[in-house]
UniProtKB/Swiss-Prot annotation:
UniProt protein name: Dual specificity protein kinase YAK1
Major subcellular location class: cytoplasm
Biased composition (Polar residues): 20-31, 149-160, 732-758
One GO term describing the cellular component: nucleus
SMART domains found in the cross-reference section: S_TKc
Reported modifications of this chain: Phosphorylated; highly.
The EC number(s) this enzyme carries: 2.7.12.1
Native organism taxonomy: Eukaryota, Fungi, Dikarya, Ascomycota, Saccharomycotina
Length: 807
């Protein structure tokens, strides 16, 4: 700037200082010797002791003083805008700028502007006047922990004298002083333009902030004593928010950047293309940069980690008052649906108690079971994983529905488990579930059990529904048979034996336990007729015949076959489809069962004499068309999961494990084990419940005892009932059963004690052998025979006249 501008600036500063004096005097009337001059001192030569001025100031009211002070400030601002001139200095220590186009990109119409023109011509500029340097990637964040202090020797303005300034600000002041672009007396002016705003250094530093150098000495202190501690500012706008990243000796090629900007760059506008298929897509893979903002080599914290894994720490840094406790988390609901509809809002529409995580059960009866998670949900209610807050033990709690029918059934289960745990199996050796406690919570019966692992169905699912090894099947079958032996001796029926109700004690041990005695009953009190899950339902239940503990043996046979095959052997979609699958695989049940069954007429059709293929075949299964037409339902044909229909063929032709496919010796051993398994399944899957093996008999089979299987095996001391002169009805039923085995429709069926049929042969049952073994039968009705204790309504002569003597 020229000297005239300097004089104007100095005069404006003096006027500003003089204009502040009246306010200072009026605010401090007692300090009359303050040495400040009135606005008239420069013209009248009077000091502050002018009586007219003192009297005039003392007579003014505070409101008038405030208005005058406001008017004076407006005049000062207008005078400053008129007197201040714009001065730009190259911040990168380039040669002295004489023409604005040498370092600024201005339109042609401003070429003739000289340095004395007003700044008003430049207010319309929207583009940045300075091209900022590139930011350094992956900086060291500890570099900005502290800045070199920049303090002034003058403390006339206390509010601005204690701040710290970065070295970039000092660097610019040093360059401006060395170039002589501004007179030293103007360094104290607050309107000298600067690249730096003090607010820029109070903002949060970026992860890629620039590198400030502190290799420059501070400015001389012999500047204007009034405002030398205020940072140099631009009157209207900051030129750039980014200070230079290098020191003057290492000048970056900014000339090339400005030259490119003058020449202009072509903008790449993205174009939209129609894509009809994925082949039209042409993705561009950008190369990964060598250095990233948040890398393993940098000391910065990844923003992604700070807002995810370390979110609590981030909140704590932002607000010291922030606290977090997991106990205050909203409780996660475990029951679906979770809307309260019954029981004062505690139950949903299905009468299930609405459970939440961290709920405490049993408080009303001095129990404390903390709910952790849900284990399962069924028709009876829910099973949740809980912790006993008194003993710190992890348990399973069964929360029964609040309906009366489910409550009655659960009370029966609790009584049976109490009988098993305390009297029948107090030593916990026979693989029964242990019940520890029972209580009522919000009108719901809660049973506390030991916590077990996965069930057998989940085990098959983990094995991708491939069959297990015969050795593991033998281990599981032995434990289940041990439990069934205890139940038969106690005259108890489980009534719902299936893979879902057989649980592993631990995921790494082949130890089992039987659960869910909610459907259990005593042999003498068989009240319900619709029991068992469909896949494992015995034929006598489907036909409507009185049942006994033999139905559990049928379920065991279905479970063993499923463990070997990986899928259920009889996956019926309905009762009609279930009975169809059983007959296709094992043959027709004996005629006395069909005649005696209450539901036989629903699935069977009695043959006319001319339609019967033999004198003993009196019934046949209804076709799908006949069954659907009669009951007005839609029944789909059975889906075949196996290539073969008969049980022996299914077992023999099941795929070999990969571990033995290359060894003929291992294959021969596998086939021998399969023949033993076929014979075992033939005994427990006998359609006749009177001839079906008991648990005690099955425990002696070579498949369980690992004895050598020669192809023939009979339970020790067992005998089959045969024709008897005393019991004509029994004779007719047995002869009818034996002759039915001769029909070609039952060829290949594995009948109970015939070894040839167990190997898949078509020979009929040897009636002579059966007649010889009948001599060992006793004439008295055995009280141990289960069916005699479960007789319901209807004819029972066949059950009362047949008997088996058990050891």
């Amino acid at each position: 700037m020229n000297s005239s501008n300097n004089n104007d600036s100095s005069s404006s500063n003096s006027n500003m200082n003089n204009s502040l004096s009246p306010t200072l005097v009026t605010h401090s009337d007692a300090s009359m010797g303050s040495g400040r001059a009135s606005p008239d001192n420069s013209h009248m030569g009077r000091g502050i002791w002018n009586p007219s001025y003192v009297n005039q100031g003392s007579q003014r009211s505070p409101q008038q003083q405030h208005q005058n002070h406001h008017q004076q400030q407006q005049q000062q601002q207008q005078q400053q805008q008129q007197n201040s001139q714009f001065c730009f200095v190259n911040p990168w220590n380039e040669e002295k700028v004489t023409n604005s186009q040498q370092n600024l990109v201005y339109p042609p119409q401003y070429d003739d502007l000289n340095s004395n023109e007003s700044l008003d011509a430049y207010r319309r500029r929207k583009s940045s006047l300075v091209v900022p340097p590139a930011r350094a990637p992956a900086p060291n964040p500890f570099q900005y922990d502290s800045y070199p202090a920049y303090t002034s020797s003058n403390t006339s303005l206390a509010g601005n004298s204690s701040g710290q300034y970065p070295s970039g600000y000092q660097q610019q002041q040093q360059q401006v002083y060395q170039q002589g672009a501004i007179h030293p007396s103007q360094f104290g002016s607050r309107f000298v333009p600067s690249l730096y705003d003090r607010q820029d250094f109070q903002r949060r530093q970026s992860l890629a902030a620039t590198n400030y150098s502190s290799n420059f000495s501070s400015l001389n202190s012999n500047t204007n004593q009034g405002t030398n501690s205020i940072p140099v500012m631009s009157p209207y706008r900051r030129l750039s928010a980014y200070p230079p990243s290098t020191s003057p000796p290492l000048q970056p090629p900014f000339k090339q950047l400005r030259r490119d900007e003058v020449q202009g760059q072509k903008l790449s506008i993205p174009q939209m293309q129609l894509c009809n298929s994925k082949n039209d897509l042409q993705p561009v893979l950008n190369a990964t940069p060598k250095f990233r903002r948040a890398s393993l080599n940098s000391k910065t914290i990844s923003p992604l980690v700070s807002v995810t894994k370390s979110l609590i720490t981030t909140y704590s840094l932002c607000s010291p008052e922030f606290t977090y406790q997991t106990s205050k988390n909203p409780k996660r609901v475990l029951t679906k649906p979770s809307e309260g509809k019954c029981n004062n809002g505690f139950d949903n529409i299905n009468s299930d108690y609405i459970l939440y995580v961290n709920d405490v059960l049993g408080v009303e009866q001095n129990r404390k079971y903390l709910v952790l998670d849900i284990l399962g949900q069924g028709t009876f209610g829910q099973v949740v994983k809980c912790q006993n807050l008194l003993t710190k033990e992890i348990l399973a709690v069964k929360v029964v529905k609040s309906r009366t029918e489910y409550l009655t059934q659960s009370i029966t289960e609790a009584k049976i488990l109490e009988l098993l745990n305390q009297k029948i199996d107090p030593t916990n050796k026979h693989h029964f579930l242990r019940m520890y406690d029972s209580f009522v919570h919000k009108n719901h019966l809660c049973l506390v059990f030991e916590l077990l692992s996965n069930n057998l169905y989940e085990l098959l699912k983990q094995n991708k529904f491939h069959g297990l090894s015969i050795q593991l099947i033998r281990t599981f079958t032995t434990q289940i048979l041990d439990s069934l032996c205890v139940l038969k001796e106690s005259k108890l029926i489980h009534c719902d034996l299936k893979p879902e109700n057989i649980l592993l004690c631990a995921p790494d041990k082949p130890e089992l336990k039987i659960i869910d005695f909610g459907s259990s009953c005593e042999e003498a009190r068989t009240v319900y007729t619709y029991i068992q899950s469909r896949f494992y339902r015995a034929p006598e239940i489907i036909l409507g015949i009185p049942y006994s503990t033999s139905i559990d043996m049928w379920s065991l046979g279905c479970i063993v076959a499923e463990l070997f095959l990986g899928i259920p052997i009889f996956p019926g979609a309905s009762e009609y489809n279930q009975l169809t699958r059983i007959i296709d695989t094992l043959g027709y049940p004996p005629s006395w069962m069909i005649d005696m069954g209450k539901n036989s007429g629903k699935f069977m059709k009695k043959l006319a004499p001319e339609e019967s293929s033999s004198s003993t075949q009196k019934h046949r299964m209804k076709t799908i068309e006949e069954f659907c037409r009669e009951y007005n339902i839609v029944e789909k044909p059975s889906k075949q999961y196996f290539k073969w229909r008969k049980l022996p063929d299914i077992i023999r032709n099941y795929r070999y494990p990969k571990s033995i496919q290359n060894s003929q010796e291992l294959i021969d051993q596998e086939m021998q084990n399969r023949e033993c398994l076929i014979h075992f399944l033939g005994g427990v899957l006998n359609l006749n419940p009177l001839e079906r093996w008991t648990p005690q008999q099955a425990m002696l089979h070579p498949f369980i005892t690992k004895q050598e299987f020669t192809g023939e095996w009979f339970p020790p001391g067992s005998s089959l009932p045969g024709p008897s002169e005393k019991h004509d009805d029994a004779k007719g039923q047995q002869s009818e059963y034996g002759s039915a085995n001769d029909s070609s429709n039952n060829a290949g069926h594995n009948y109970v004690y015939n070894p040839s049929s167990a190997t898949g042969g078509a020979d009929s049952v040897d009636i002579g052998a059966i007649s010889k073994r009948k001599e060992n039968t006793s004439g008295d009705i055995s009280n141990n025979f289960a069916v005699t204790h479960s007789v319901q309504e209807g004819p029972t002569s066949a059950f009362n006249k047949l008997h088996i003597v058990e050891e």
